[in-house]
């Protein structure tokens, strides 16, 4: 019954959705980074935007981001609740990331980033359980900023997916598949399939994602 109600709500939302692409409502992006961090920068440029997990909830309603939205409107996950997680850029990312200095977060001074560590992981355990109790299907966007910062953190998501059948994850990682963290992320795709839809940045092909230089031809 709960799933039918959420699907009906998604259908109403789909009919109401409007085009929010930047090329329709404002100036198209130039492809040139507006703010470039120093090569030695190790964390966010905006330390005042850091939050402790106890300030939570750490999982935010997808409605807070117009490009994501709060609910899946079409497809096999129609009706799923969408939430997002934002960590500290660079502090949680591999140093090999091609976007280290030109990170999206450089132009996001007001976005709250949650400090990583055991308190974050404990908060995620609680919040995912509560969301999966309330909704038949929950889709988590990892990460608006930041990345998978440790093997223990990756293992947390493995446990959560095994524990909650209605949990789904999508996002990107800068960890190459040849690294320990990257190979674990790729292995989880084999285990959980589309429930763990995490792509590797900086490469093409299946499960890859890359930046196209501007201007395009």
Segments predicted by a language model, with ranges:
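Class I S-adenosyl-L-methionine
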Residues: 1-217
